[in-house]
């Protein structure tokens, strides 16, 4: 919503996006999964993307410190899910984006080394991913959006995000 509000100069949408952003942070709890799609890495990724695009001003190391600490509670050597949506590759997508914005001070070097070892041990591709690589493209043409799913994954919002990020 922030990207949409910025692209179209919609202040009402920007205020609504801010309210939703705060609700996400209020909803963070200790037993959340670490994944990109429904977990802590996704919250971190979204926050980092907003900061990178200049839509929120913050120190990522300050605002994401608690989230990063909760992620580090999971031993990277014991992670078995290597997927983008809920596993190691999604965590790497988040960290790669973070490092592209500012030096990541909230993850300790040992954790990062153990995570890299997990990536190497499982022969995960080293190429950087883009969020669009993770999402499913809708099965309907962009012009036929009426009465279609609204979501970002396989829905109408996919086309909006794609046009904004290009």
Which residues does each PLM region occupy?
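Extended ligand-binding groove/face enriched in aromatic
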Residues: 15-106
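Alpha-helical bundle segments that constitute or directly flank the non-heme di-iron/ferroxidase center
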Residues: 6
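Terminal, non-catalytic domain-edge segments
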Residues: 66, 70, 88, 92-166
């Amino acid at each position: 919503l922030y990207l949409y509000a910025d692209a179209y100069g919609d202040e009402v949408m920007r205020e609504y996006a801010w309210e939703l952003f705060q609700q996400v942070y209020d909803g963070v709890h200790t037993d959340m999964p670490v994944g990109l799609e429904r977990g802590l890495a996704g919250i971190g990724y979204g926050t980092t993307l907003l900061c990178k695009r200049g839509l929120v001003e913050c120190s990522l190391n300050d605002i994401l410190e608690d989230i990063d600490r909760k992620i580090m509670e999971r031993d990277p050597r014991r992670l078995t899910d290597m997927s983008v949506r809920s596993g190691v590759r999604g965590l790497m997508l988040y960290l790669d984006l973070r490092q592209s914005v500012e030096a990541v001070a909230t993850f300790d070097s040992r954790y990062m080394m153990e995570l890299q070892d997990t990536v190497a041990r499982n022969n995960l591709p080293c190429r950087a991913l883009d969020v669009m690589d993770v999402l499913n493209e809708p099965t309907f043409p962009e012009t036929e959006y009426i009465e279609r799913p609204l979501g970002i994954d396989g829905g109408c919002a996919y086309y909006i995000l794609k046009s904004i990020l290009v």
